[in-house]
């Protein structure tokens, strides 16, 4: 078993380049199934386990997929099958986004109920409601969602919650539907805009991505195209916090300020200096951090995917902070691990009361989900002694070479095979 070991106390300085966004690339890869002509070429693709998983799903569906360096090519011109099996979908709930493209392209889709990080229920009912509105017959049997439609017809769909996945799935299904589809109360994340741009480059007619209403005029066919994935705003935010908590000076290359404006506002409120430069965002950490309250919200509110990382900087600030989670239930599983590092945190309903500044101590902790994995490593950067983070399978779903990038900025961090180290002499690693 691998673990990441961090020796706290080093200031981070230098520059770090962001990779393509995990939350953008997965639906874009799924959308390549819609192209009945040509070969799709996707650039700036991050080297993540989730990308390999979605590629395997497409291969199973009879698409020809290759992934070399940061480029994925997909030829979906053959006879696409419509059954996405449990063995792949259980690894990653985002696999559900193949359902819309399959339904539009083949008239049917059979997809296993999804897995991934265990963050609350995250139901798929909003996805299915959209498919049904367009004329699909949907049923759930034996752990699979089955949808069939002789033809999809444009419809008006109102989402009870601005779900990112449902917005993406319904939008993709609507591209080949007959007539016009209007989706209201949609997600407005940058990843939605990136997907819409890709679909439009393929010949779709999607209007309004980034606003609360998306309108899709159905077309008869889509043609493969070339597309570069937007930079990962969550990776950028994670490194911004790493720079801030260590009192460092780091340029986050390719970070897009408009994509993380809520995070920038909160960090500036805490006393962190943020400078927008031509090729990214520079973050300069202060001597003291001011306490702030944060509430996660759908975009353009504070992103739930930055919640656990933000709690690290909150527990280092002077005074009492509150983190309130409104997007997902059960997303405080990492709190118990942070307490092992001497964090003063108390869960009250959907909020965590955080008293600071904490004097963090190194400990052996286990990642409970993708973003918690990164947050525990961040905490290790400022803890006294050695922090050992296990369950790296979560980290690898969303961060490529995270420890290597931190090393390049000056952190004492190593990724090691647990069976090959002497835990009584961790100093020998550095």
UniProtKB/Swiss-Prot annotation:
Major localisation: cytoplasm
Modification 2-(S-cysteinyl)pyruvic acid O-phosphothioketal occurs at: 117
Residues that, per the record, bind phosphoenolpyruvate: 22-23
Keyword line: Cell cycle, Cell division, Cell shape, Cell wall biogenesis/degradation, Cytoplasm, Peptidoglycan synthesis, Pyruvate, Transferase
Annotated gene: murA1
Origin organism lineage: Bacteria, Bacillati, Bacillota, Bacilli, Bacillales
Gene Ontology terms for molecular function: UDP-N-acetylglucosamine 1-carboxyvinyltransferase activity
GO annotations of cellular component type: cytoplasm
Stored SUPFAM superfamilies: EPT/RTPC-like
Pfam families: EPSP_synthase
The keyword Cell division belongs to this UniProt entry's keyword annotation: yes
Name of the featured protein: UDP-N-acetylglucosamine 1-carboxyvinyltransferase 1
Stored NCBIfam families: murA (TIGR01072), PRK09369.1 (NF006873)
Top EC group: transferase
CDD domains the record matches: UdpNAET
Residues annotated as the enzyme's active site: 117
Gene3D superfamilies the UniProt entry points to: Enolpyruvate transferase domain
């Amino acid at each position: 078993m691998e673990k990441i070991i961090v020796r706290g106390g080093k200031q981070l300085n230098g520059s770090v380049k962001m990779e393509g966004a995990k939350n953008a690339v997965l639906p874009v890869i799924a959308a390549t199934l819609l192209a009945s002509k040509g070969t799709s070429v996707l650039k700036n693709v991050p080297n993540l386990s989730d990308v390999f998983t979605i590629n395997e799903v497409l291969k199973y569906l009879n698409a020809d997929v290759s992934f070399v360096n940061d480029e994925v090519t997909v030829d979906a011109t053959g006879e696409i099958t419509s059954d996405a099996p449990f063995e792949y979908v259980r690894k990653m709930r985002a696999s559900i986004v193949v359902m819309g493209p399959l339904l539009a392209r083949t008239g049917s889709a059979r997809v296993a109920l999804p897995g991934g990080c265990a963050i609350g229920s995250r139901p798929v009912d909003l996805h299915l409601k959209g498919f049904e509105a367009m004329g699909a017959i949907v049923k759930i049997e034996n752990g699979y969602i089955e949808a069939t439609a002789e033809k999809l017809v444009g419809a008006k769909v109102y989402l009870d919650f601005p779900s990112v996945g449902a917005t993406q799935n319904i939008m993709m299904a609507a591209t080949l539907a007959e007539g016009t589809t209007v989706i209201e109360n949609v997600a407005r994340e940058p990843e939605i805009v990136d997907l819409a741009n890709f679909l439009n480059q393929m010949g779709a007619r999607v209007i309004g991505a980034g606003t609360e209403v998306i309108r899709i005029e159905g077309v008869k066919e889509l043609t493969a195209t070339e597309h570069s994935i937007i930079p990962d705003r969550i990776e950028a935010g994670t490194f911004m916090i790493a720079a801030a908590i260590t009192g460092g000076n780091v340029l986050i290359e390719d970070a897009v300020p408009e994509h993380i404006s809520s995070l920038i506002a909160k960090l500036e409120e805490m006393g962190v200096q943020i400078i927008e430069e031509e090729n990214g965002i520079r973050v300069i950490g202060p001597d003291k951090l001011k306490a702030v309250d944060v509430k996660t919200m759908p975009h353009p509110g504070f992103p739930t995917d930055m919640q656990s990382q933000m709690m690290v900087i909150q527990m280092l600030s002077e005074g009492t902070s509150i983190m309130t989670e409104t997007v997902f239930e059960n997303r405080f599983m990492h709190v118990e691990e942070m307490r092992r590092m001497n964090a003063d945190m108390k869960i009250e309903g959907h909020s965590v009361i955080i008293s600071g500044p904490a004097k963090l101590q190194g400990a052996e902790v286990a990642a409970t989900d993708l973003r918690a994995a990164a947050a525990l490593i961040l905490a290790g950067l400022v803890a006294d002694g050695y922090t050992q983070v296990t369950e790296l399978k979560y980290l690898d779903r969303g961060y490529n070479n995270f420890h290597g990038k931190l090393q390049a900025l000056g952190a004492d961090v190593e990724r090691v095979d647990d069976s090959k180290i002497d835990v009584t002499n961790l100093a020998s690693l550095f």
